[in-house]
């Protein structure tokens, strides 16, 4: 047995340092080294509790090293749509998540397999919600023995990473019973119950999936939308289970003009499709996110793509910040965390991202960074209240809060403050 006295513990971002150790193993034969390996690990203890919220629905709540953890983060699919992300490039992506004050990434359907992803999550204190390769349309597989062998290899290969916080069987569904039982029993044996195995990503202590749209902040403060997707009831429950722990909620996120120019030919820049042109296309993502309509309603019609992109960043900030702040407002009373869909783009896109494919931060990036700061002051646009949100381990006393109002040109127009 390896005994470490007074170890420095591994902590997620915002709760302490992600301390790591390196163990060097050497195998010798007749006094000569035949093989050696360095193993990096962190010392931590994950725990999980179901705590009923205000609507008496159990909420999955995470603890690490005895400390209750408020989850803030986002979902990843692929690292890059042509599988060209390797090595140090993962560090750039993970550091951007740390900079947004996130502490968790959910690997949707386990799309990322590179060791470097986990290494940098360990290094920067980003916990990993680790899915297996099943989702709502496919909860069974053609060759179950091959699936089981891959699952066993995955757990054995990754279990030493302190960043892995939970294993999850399937996205928005449960694995077929035989696979579900295998995964639960295998993880209990191979990971020694160090991390929870959870069958489904959005049920059983979790509050569903969605919304996916650009609702104003006031909307999110007033309703969790846990029974809705694209504003069409009822999914996945048919009733509202409160804010709870949400593993998916997302919006369209328009990139900056500098990035749009890189993947849209100039002849297609302008004009954008009108609401009238799209009114009968119910499956159009633009319609489902209400993006163009909201930009035009709040900031006026644009005369060019560049002007529209500039205004879009203001909406990106407002909507992303509003979602996180609505969950902040209910912290420990009704909910335990929020993971947005998605925080990382695998390709050039107009939806589901914080920074874009070219690493240019959108307004959503700055909205997330602000709302997720470890000590945050926020305004509830529904009841006009001000609240200080503290997700650190330290009590806050004698703090001075200051609010400053700027116009759209960045000029200060009013300010006031208070000590409490």
Mark where each language-model region is.
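Secreted/periplasmic carbohydrate-active enzymes, especially glycoside hydrolases
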Residues: 1-104, 108, 331-335, 360, ...
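Short, well-ordered amphipathic alpha-helices
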Residues: 3-6, 24, 184, 321-326
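Active-site-adjacent substrate/metal-binding segments within catalytic domains
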Residues: 7-8, 24, 32-166, 280-310, ...
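A broadly tuned preference for mixed-charge, low-complexity surface segments
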Residues: 23, 125, 158-179, 222-223, ...
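A general secondary-structure junction signal
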Residues: 45, 201, 342-344
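Substrate-binding/catalytic cleft of secreted carbohydrate-active enzymes
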Residues: 104-282, 315, 319, 335-337, ...
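Substrate-binding clefts and catalytic carboxylate motifs of secreted carbohydrate-active enzymes
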Residues: 229-397, 410-413
């Amino acid at each position: 047995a390896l005994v470490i006295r007074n170890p420095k513990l591994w902590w997620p971002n915002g709760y302490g340092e992600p301390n790591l150790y390196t163990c060097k193993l050497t195998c010798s034969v007749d006094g000569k080294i035949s093989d050696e390996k360095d193993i990096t690990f962190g010392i931590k203890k994950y725990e999980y509790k179901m705590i009923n919220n205000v609507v008496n629905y159990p909420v999955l709540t995470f603890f690490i090293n005895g400390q209750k953890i408020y989850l803030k983060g986002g979902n990843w699919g692929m690292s890059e749509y042509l599988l060209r992300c390797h090595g140090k490039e993962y560090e750039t992506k993970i550091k951007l998540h740390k900079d947004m004050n996130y502490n968790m990434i959910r690997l949707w359907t386990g799309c990322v397999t590179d060791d470097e992803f986990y290494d940098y999550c360990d290094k920067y204190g980003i916990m990993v919600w680790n899915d297996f390769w099943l989702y709502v349309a496919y909860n069974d597989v053609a060759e179950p023995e091959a699936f089981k062998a891959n699952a066993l290899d995955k757990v054995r290969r990754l279990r030493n990473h302190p960043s892995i916080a939970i294993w999850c069987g399937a996205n928005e569904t449960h694995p077929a019973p035989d696979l579900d039982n295998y995964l639960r029993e295998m993880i209990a044996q191979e990971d020694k119950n160090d991390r929870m195995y959870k069958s489904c990503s959005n049920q059983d202590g979790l509050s569903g999936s969605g919304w996916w749209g650009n609702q104003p902040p006031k909307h999110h403060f007033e309703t969790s939308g846990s029974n809705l997707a694209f504003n069409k009831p009822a999914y996945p429950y048919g009733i509202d289970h409160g804010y709870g722990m949400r593993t998916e909620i997302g919006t369209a996120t328009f990139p900056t003009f500098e990035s749009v120019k890189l993947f849209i030919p100039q002849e297609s820049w302008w004009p954008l499709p009108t609401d009238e042109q799209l009114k009968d296309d119910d499956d159009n993502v633009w319609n489902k996110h209400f993006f163009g309509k909201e930009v035009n309603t709040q900031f006026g019609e644009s005369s060019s793509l560049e002007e529209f992109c500039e205004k879009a960043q203001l909406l990106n900030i407002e909507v992303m910040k509003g979602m996180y702040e609505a969950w902040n407002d209910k912290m420990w009373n009704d909910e335990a965390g929020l993971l947005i869909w998605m925080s990382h783009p695998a390709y050039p896109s107009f939806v589901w991202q914080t920074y874009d494919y070219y690493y240019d931060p959108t307004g959503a990036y700055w909205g997330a960074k602000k709302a997720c700061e470890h000590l945050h002051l926020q305004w509830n646009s529904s009841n006009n209240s001000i609240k200080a949100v503290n997700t650190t381990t330290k009590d806050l006393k004698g703090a001075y809060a200051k609010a400053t109002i700027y116009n759209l040109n960045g000029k200060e127009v009013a300010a006031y403050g208070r000590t409490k």
